[in-house]
Curated annotation (Swiss-Prot):
Gene coding for it: pepT
Function, as annotated: Cleaves the N-terminal amino acid of tripeptides.
Entry's EC annotation: 3.4.11.4
Family, per entry: Belongs to the peptidase M20B family.
Swiss-Prot/TrEMBL catalytic activity: Release of the N-terminal residue from a tripeptide
Organism: Shewanella halifaxensis (strain HAW-EB4)
PROSITE patterns the UniProt entry points to: ARGE_DAPE_CPG2_1
Name of the protein in its database record: Peptidase T
Length: 407
């Protein structure tokens, strides 16, 4: 299984599937559809049933049940890689029997246990790293490789009891659109798991409540030589507004269950300037308080202005899946037991972000998140451990077996 996983993963990361938040297309990049077509052909050749690729880039397939009366479950991963860092010409490095020392990434970069202490747990194992010029794509091509490998194992080992199993590979998860065209009804699963986490043992069913706020400052432009008493610089208004934001309530000062405001982007000219913030909190009431506080700050600042004005638009992005998953405790219990059966210690922690599963849970498909075995996603220091990928694959198989016992 290890060699098969490795070969499958290396094949997948050769596809540059970065999504593009500026695009209105679905998928946002054609390369995701090309990758999905490749996977469709592979699934058909491996004997999966009902292999379908929608015009929106959603790839689904089925492993038929070999026992009756068992819940249909699903496994989900995403096709795209993050637009945050280059995904072109990915050149993986395979480090066998890792010795615990610095790993050279090309000529200029280093992956060091001094900076990334997680490396210390993988001494003696096989790592896949970047060459320093791109991200790796383990998020989420490791998840895709693990799902296909696990479900193919079930197809070729009919002695393992399991119910009907569905898979779906979604586009544009990294830009928050992965669930936009997901057809929960036709998917037909009672619950599902995204395979989109990090280190071995991660089991996540809490995520941020998330919103985006766009604060717009309006000014008045004129020739700077005749600007006295006339010009209103929207950029100055925006900068002074941001100076009123709490300095410590930001991502770089938060961890665990802390929420934050994050200035994601700012742009403007004299006439108009915009500040784009993301708002995050695990607690729903605190989340609502944050949105109210920011709105009130805009109102107070407007009252101080003699000229110029701010407006604010806040849109919710996704909510904490915890409220939708906890009423179905068997979903978590089965995943925990599957790991324990494989001598894996479950690591239950909140997702300081979101997954397709967070939105799908509110669409009627409870969907916690499981580990892939990767680290340092979205950048040049990304790496995955092949032995961890094997464990993720085995966990998927074990979940299928345990679900067959849960009637």
């Amino acid at each position: 299984m290890k060699q098969q996983l490795l070969e499958r993963f290396l094949s997948y990361v050769s596809f540059n599937t970065q999504s593009d938040g500026r695009s209105q297309n679905v998928p946002s990049t054609h390369s995701q559809f090309v990758f999905a077509q490749h996977l469709r052909q592979e699934l058909v050749s491996l004997g999966f049933e009902d292999v379908q690729l929608s015009d929106k880039g959603y790839l689904t397939a089925t492993v038929p049940a070999n026992v009756e009366g068992v819940a249909c479950i699903g496994f989900i991963a995403h096709l795209d890689t993050a637009p945050d860092y280059s995904g072109e010409n990915v050149s993986p490095q395979i480090i066998e029997n890792y010795n615990g020392e610095d790993i050279q990434l090309g000529l200029e970069e280093v992956l060091s246990p001094k900076q990334f202490s997680s490396l210390n747990q993988y001494i003696g194992q096989t790592l896949i790293t970047t060459d320093g010029s791109s991200l790796l794509g383990g998020d989420d091509k490791a998840g895709i490789a693990e799902i296909i490998s696990a479900l193919h194992h079930l197809l070729t080992h009919p002695e393992i009891p399991h119910g009907k199993i569905r898979l779906c590979f979604t586009p544009d998860e990294e830009i928050g659109r992965g669930a936009d065209h997901f057809d929960v009804e036709s998917f037909g699963a009672q619950w599902a798991y995204t395979i989109d986490g990090g280190q071995v043992g991660e089991l996540e069913y809490e995520n941020f409540n998330a919103a985006t706020a766009v604060v717009t400052a309006m000014g008045n432009n004129c020739h700077p030589g005749t600007a006295y008493g006339v010009m209103v610089n929207a950029q100055t208004i925006a900068a002074r507004f941001h100076a009123k934001m709490p300095l410590k309530d930001t991502p770089e000062h938060s961890r665990d269950y802390d929420g934050f405001f994050h200035l994601l982007g700012m742009e403007g000219v004299t006439e108009k300037a915009t500040l784009t913030y993301i708002i995050r909190d695990f607690d729903l009431e605190l989340f609502e308080q944050r949105k109210r506080w920011l709105t009130e700050l805009v109102e107070k600042y407007n009252a101080e202005l003699s000229i110029g004005q701010l407006t604010i638009d806040i849109q919710d992005s996704y909510l904490n899946m915890k409220q939708q998953v906890l009423p179905h405790p068997h979903i978590i219990d089965i995943a925990k037991q599957a790991m324990q059966n494989l001598a894996i210690e479950p690591i239950i922690k909140p997702i300081r972000g979101g997954t397709d599963g967070s939105r799908l849970s509110y669409m009627g498909l409870p969907c916690p998140n499981l580990f892939t075995g990767g680290h340092n996603f979205h950048g040049k220091h990304e790496y995955v451990c092949v032995e961890s990928m094997v464990k993720a694959t085995e966990t998927i198989v074990e979940i299928a077996k345990l679900t067959a016992q849960h009637k």
